[in-house]
From Swiss-Prot:
One annotated Gene Ontology cellular component of this protein: cytosol
TM helices/strands, residue ranges: none
Record-given protein name: DNA polymerase IV
Keywords recorded for this protein, A-Z: Cytoplasm, DNA damage, DNA repair, DNA replication, DNA-binding, DNA-directed DNA polymerase, Magnesium, Metal-binding, Mutator protein, Nucleotidyltransferase, Transferase
UniProt organism field: Francisella tularensis subsp. mediasiatica (strain FSC147)
HAMAP family per UniProt: DNApol_IV
Keyword Zinc assigned: no
Length: 349
């Protein structure tokens, strides 16, 4: 009999904005956003919940955000500050278990299956982690507790901010049936549109499609979709995963018809990418990459050798790649390629 796993997904609430709010309490009752400080060409990185009440959202052009909320305060990003807070939070994770899989500065998976403290209750452990984070940083995070990574991540988003949601093994079937398929890991806008065209909008709808049908439509990912629709996810929490790259991408609802439109998206993508890169990643960068998907679903990319993440080089890659395009752009991705860390070189510093 397979041992039931106990997985926690912790996702810090409006992390960049919350760190800024903690550093400057006068912001607490005011609508503000981080990033996108150029009112004409900027893009919002994140915002507090007061700003969200006005309709301001992450990745929104600053000009639109200011129309929705004319008194919106704009702050420059301060990654040194965010990384310092993230380091404290990560140490807290490791004080509970060694099985920690960081996803970015503000979220991680923890496998607490074998943790004996707190009556071996994942719910009690999640509560303790949240409390410890608040005690040491003054910041709140939301937690999802479930038998696997898929459901834990979905659960962590349900009661935000400062929430906790638990999906027990007996609740899995009822929990997943009404879930929109867009909540499933790996289902982006393109996959969502493809599923919707066949009448699939919820996991219950997805359960009606056979494994063979899904594999035929989605290839290898079809097998994963078949399992995810049933709340099955066998991915392990991987504390020592060796990453070959770190990347971010965004699919845009409005096609990007000009080079200028593409370049306007770089600041928000860059901020998102740097938030996911750890100190160890910075030491092992061997290249940077830009990729496009156009409206005909043609995929192109360019990679350049680099030892650092350089925004100007990314801009030049976007310009170079755009010259090869024949159709408007639907998706832009940027990232870094990682290699082996040279320990001898690190010791010199």
């Amino acid at each position: 009999m397979t041992k039931l796993r106990k997985i926690i997904h912790i996702d810090m609430d409006y992390f960049f904005a919350q760190v800024e709010e903690k550093a400057n309490p006068s912001l607490k009752d005011k609508p503000f956003a981080v990033g996108g400080t150029n009112p004409k060409r900027g893009v919002i990185s994140t915002c507090n919940y007061i700003a969200r009440e006005y309709g301001v959202r992450s990745a929104m052009p600053t000009a639109i955000a200011m129309q929705k909320c004319p008194n919106l305060i704009l702050l420059n990003t301060d990654f040194a500050k965010y990384k310092a807070a993230s380091a404290v939070i990560r140490d807290i994770f490791y004080s509970f278990t060694d099985k920690v899989e960081p996803l970015s500065l503000d979220e991680a998976y923890l496998d607490v299956t074998d943790v004996k403290e707190y009556k071996n209750s994942a719910t009690l452990i999640a509560q303790a982690i949240k409390q410890e984070i608040f005690n040491k940083t003054g910041l709140t995070g939301s937690a999802g507790v479930a038998p696997n990574k898929l459901l834990a991540k979905i659960a962590s988003d349900i009661n935000k901010p400062n929430g906790l949601y638990v999906v027990t093994p007996k609740q899995v079937d009822s929990f997943v049936k009404d879930l929109p398929v867009k909540k499933l890991f790996g289902v982006g806008k393109v996959s969502q549109e493809k599923l919707k065209s066949t009448g699939v909008e919820t996991c219950l709808d997805l359960q009606q499609l056979s494994l063979a049908t899904l594999v035929d439509k989605f290839g290898k990912f079809g097998s994963s979709l078949y399992n995810y629709a049933r709340g099955i996810d066998n991915r392990e929490v991987n504390p020592v995963r060796i990453r070959k790259s770190v990347s971010v991408e965004n699919t845009y609802l409005e096609d990007l018809k000009t080079l200028g439109a593409c370049l306007e998206k770089l600041p928000s993508l860059y901020d998102k990418l740097t938030s996911r890169i750890t100190e160890e990643h910075y030491k092992s960068i061997i290249g940077i990459v830009v990729k496009f998907t156009d409206t005909k679903f043609n995929k192109t990319s360019l990679t350049r050798v680099a030892k650092i993440l350089d925004k100007e080089m990314l801009k030049n890659l976007i310009i170079e790649l755009h010259q090869k395009q024949n159709h408007p752009i639907r998706l832009i991705g940027i990232g870094v390629k990682l290699g082996e860390i040279d320990d001898k070189q690190i010791d010199l510093f």
